[in-house]
């Protein structure tokens, strides 16, 4: 198979950048952009992440296999202030922190006690990552920029805003996650 043109798709920002910079006499707006739709409708999924130490697991000395694929998948629905519902999904991760960063925030606790406390809390962490469908807004877009990278290739600018509905969805997922963690 031979192709006259090959386009490497690399993601939501780099793909439009490649295509915008492919402009020539035949395609003045870049390959695949005859109708000026390239880069429009950029969206992201509203998401929240909650993490805590579960009191019930303090002091546990279980030997966890923290391999990949051990996530608990979560699905639920929540209500928005206008009474409408939206679905969301996520995952619960019961993992061990790579480094107990929380110890740095415990300035008032003596070092000898910090170490014992860290051992006590080590296996008790859980994280919830929740997300829902994003909204496609035409004005959210990747567009040709005015600056160039070190190779002289034109960069892109990104126009992105979120709606009140998106913020309400994130607030609702945060409330749901907080309720779940308080009951755990």
Task: Describe each model-derived feature in a short phrase.
Residues 53-61, 68-184:
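FAD-dependent oxidoreductase catalytic-site/capping-region signature
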Residues 1-65:
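Glycine-rich loop(s) and the adjacent beta-strand/alpha-helix scaffold that form part
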């Amino acid at each position: 198979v031979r192709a006259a043109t090959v386009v490497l798709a690399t993601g939501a920002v780099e793909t439009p950048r490649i295509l915008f910079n492919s402009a020539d006499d035949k395609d003045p707006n870049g390959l695949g952009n005859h109708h000026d739709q390239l880069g429009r409708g950029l969206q992201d999924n509203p998401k929240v992440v909650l993490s805590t130490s579960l009191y019930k697991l303090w002091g546990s000395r279980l030997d966890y296999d923290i391999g990949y694929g051990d996530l608990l998948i979560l699905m639920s629905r929540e209500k928005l202030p206008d009474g409408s519902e939206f679905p969301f999904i996520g995952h619960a991760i019961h993992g061990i922190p790579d480094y107990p960063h929380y110890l740095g925030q415990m300035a008032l606790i003596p070092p000898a006690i910090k170490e014992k406390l860290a051992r006590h809390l080590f296996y008790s962490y859980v994280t919830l990552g929740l997300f829902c469908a994003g909204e496609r807004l035409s004005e959210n877009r990747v567009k040709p920029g005015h600056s160039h990278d070190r190779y002289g290739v034109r960069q892109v600018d990104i126009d992105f805003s979120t709606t009140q509905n998106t913020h309400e969805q994130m607030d609702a997922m945060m409330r749901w996650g907080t309720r779940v963690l308080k009951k755990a």
